[in-house]
A protein has these predicted regions:
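Shared catalytic-loop signature of beta/alpha-barrel
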Residues: 4, 135, 141-144, 150-279
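Proline-centered loop/turn at the N-terminus of a beta-strand
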Residues: 32, 46, 116, 167, ...
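Ligand-binding pocket scaffold of soluble enzyme catalytic domains
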Residues: 28, 46, 50, 54-57, ...
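Extended hydrophobic packing segments that form well-structured cores
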Residues: 281-313
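Metal- or metallocofactor-binding catalytic centers and their adjacent structured scaffolds
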Residues: 1-29, 312-313
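Metal-dependent enolase-superfamily TIM-barrel catalytic cores that perform enediolate-based chemistry
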Residues: 44-45, 50-163
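Conserved, mostly hydrophobic/aromatic
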Residues: 17, 30, 74, 120, ...
Length: 313
C-alpha cells in the first residue's frame, strides 16, 4: 500500500486511521493538530458554499441566498441541468454549450463580482467541448473550472488547461501523491483538490499541499461529507501557505449533523470559518451518534443517451 495507489476502499480506510491518529495525538498533548503540523499561518479559512437546484431559477436563487448569508464564494455550481434518470439524454452540441454559457451568465448577474463562482462540470465533457465551454465563460471570470474532463488522462486535462484562461481544479478522485504529481508536472491543474478522506488523511494531504506549493498551485480541499471531515480539512488549511478555499457543505451547523457532533466550525458571516483552538481536530462525536446515522444503501444509477448508450459521467 505504501508504494502503489490503493483502491478507493483501501484509501478511505487508511485515511480514516490517519485522521484518527492525528486526533488522538492532538488530544494527548492538548493542542490542535495544526500545532503539531508546524503551527497556523491564518486565523480563519475562506470557504465556498454549496449551491444545489433542479432548475435554473433554483440555482440562481441559491447563489443569491449564499451571498445574503455572507459567503463570498459559491461552488458545486453546475452550468448543466440533469434530466430525470429515466429520460434518455439528448441535446445538440449547440444547445448544450450555449445553455451552459448562459447559465454562468445568470449566476454572475445574480451576485455581481462580489461572489466568486466555482464552476463544477463533474467530468461530463470531452476535451474539445471543455475548451469551447471554457472559452465561452471566460468573460464571467470563474474562480475555477472543476473537472471539465475525466481526471484519468492527465495529458487531456493539460490540453484543456492550455487552451483556456480559467484555472483548472481537479483531484477529488485521486488517492495518491503520485497522481497529483502527474497532473502538476503537466501543468494540468492550478488548484489541487485532495480529499482528506481519500489521499491518506491529514498526512497525505500535507504532502500534496507541499508538492503543489513548489509549483505555486493553490489547495482547495474536497469536502462533501461531514463536520468531522471539515474539521480535518481545517487542520491542513490552517498551516499551509498555499491554501485557497475550503469546500463547505450545506447544513454543517444545523440538525441533524449538529445533533451528532460538538465543536463544529462556525461561519463568521463574512465567508470564513473560524479556526478552533480545541485539541485534536476540534470535534467530538456525541453519545449514540453512530445510531443516529445508520448506514443507508445507495442506489447506483446511470443516465442513457437517446441512442441507448451509457452517459460517461
Amino acid at each position: 500500500l505504501h508504494r502503489r495507489a490503493p483502491t478507493e476502499a483501501e484509501a478511505g480506510a487508511l485515511s480514516a486511521l490517519d485522521i484518527a491518529l492525528w486526533d488522538i495525538a492532538g488530544k494527548h498533548f492538548g493542542v490542535p493538530v495544526y500545532q503539531l503540523l508546524g503551527g497556523k499561518v491564518r486565523d480563519r479559512c475562506r470557504v465556498y458554499y454549496h449551491v444545489f437546484g433542479e432548475t435554473r431559477k433554483e440555482l440562481v436563487d441559491g447563489v443569491k441566498d449564499a451571498k445574503a448569508q455572507g459567503f463570498t464564494a459559491v461552488g458545486h455550481l453546475t452550468p448543466f441541468l440533469d434530466e430525470e434518470r429515466d429520460v434518455p439524454y439528448f441535446k445538440t452540441h449547440a444547445e448544450k454549450i450555449t445553455e451552459a454559457i448562459d447559465a454562468v451568465r445568470l449566476y454572475r448577474e445574480a451576485v455581481g463580482n462580489e461572489v466568486d463562482l466555482c464552476i463544477e462540470v463533474h467530468r461530463r465533457l470531452t476535451p474539445a467541448e471543455a475548451v469551447q465551454l471554457g472559452l465561452g465563460i471566460e468573460k464571467y471570470h470563474p474562480y475555477f473550472f472543476e473537472d471539465p474532463v475525466t481526471p484519468d488522462n492527465f495529458d487531456e486535462m493539460a490540453y484543456v488547461a492550455d487552451k483556456i484562461n480559467i484555472p483548472i481544479a481537479t483531484g477529488e478522485r485521486y488517492t495518491s501523491l503520485w497522481e497529483f504529481e502527474m497532473a502538476l508536472s503537466r501543468n494540468a491543474v492550478q488548484y489541487v483538490r485532495p480529499d482528506v478522506c481519500l489521499v491518506g488523511g491529514i498526512s497525505g494531504s500535507k504532502k500534496i499541499a507541499a508538492l503543489a506549493e513548489a509549483r505555486h498551485v493553490g489547495v482547495v480541499p474536497h469536502n462533501p461529507l461531514s463536520p468531522v471531515s471539515t474539521a480535518a480539512c481545517l487542520q491542513i488549511a490552517a498551516c499551509i501557505p498555499n491554501f485557497a478555499l475550503q469546500e463547505y457543505p450545506i447544513g454543517e451547523d444545523r440538525a441533524p449533523k449538529s445533533d451528532m457532533v460538538t465543536g463544529i466550525a462556525q461561519h463568521d458571516g463574512q465567508g470564513y470559518l473560524v479556526l478552533s483552538d480545541r485539541p485534536g481536530i476540534g470535534v467530538e462525536l456525541k453519545p449514540n451518534a453512530a445510531k443516529k446515522a445508520p448506514m443507508k444503501p445507495r442506489e447506483v444509477t446511470t443516465r442513457l443517451h437517446a441512442d441507448g448508450s451509457v452517459v460517461d459521467q
